[in-house]
Amino acid sequence: PIAIFEFKSAIKEDTTTFDAWEQIHYRYNRDIPNLTKYCFLSVISDGANTRMGSVFTPYEYYYSWNKVNYKENVSNGISSLVTMIKGAFSKKRLINIIRDFIYYPDNDSKSIAIVTRYPQYFAAYKMLENIKDHLKPKGDGKGGTYFGATGSGKTYTLLFLSRMLATHHRDIFQNPTIIIIVDR
């Protein structure tokens, strides 16, 4: 499968999303390794809290997908599962996430996969459209500025955008030179 969902009961107080995460990361990886071999995404839920990551993502980096599209209000609680399914798992969006929004850093010591968060996804697409709209000769040549709070994943957002600039609309972007300057 390309995604694994592990659900825990919302009415049992002794089961949590952490239990769901442990089941995927320890039991499934140990007992059913072929299940996770080509799995890109994993979702954990206790009915009220739903989060997404990869089979390599530490629990603290699982996140909620709180919007179906960038114009909607944030949803949470019981509606969070429906929002995640509509927002991250619609056919077109799921293909986009798998193709452009999962990053596997080079690391010999452990397996790592960075999966986009919904603000990164929407920001990268919005910037892509803005860059296309401002290309010369019809536009002013300015791509714009992206501002994000500390810890919001700006570097990954720009990495995802760079991947799209380099691989999509080759007729428009014509082999762009991309320079990313980070402060670390």
Residue ranges and their predicted role:
Residues 1-182:
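ATP-dependent helicase/translocase motor core
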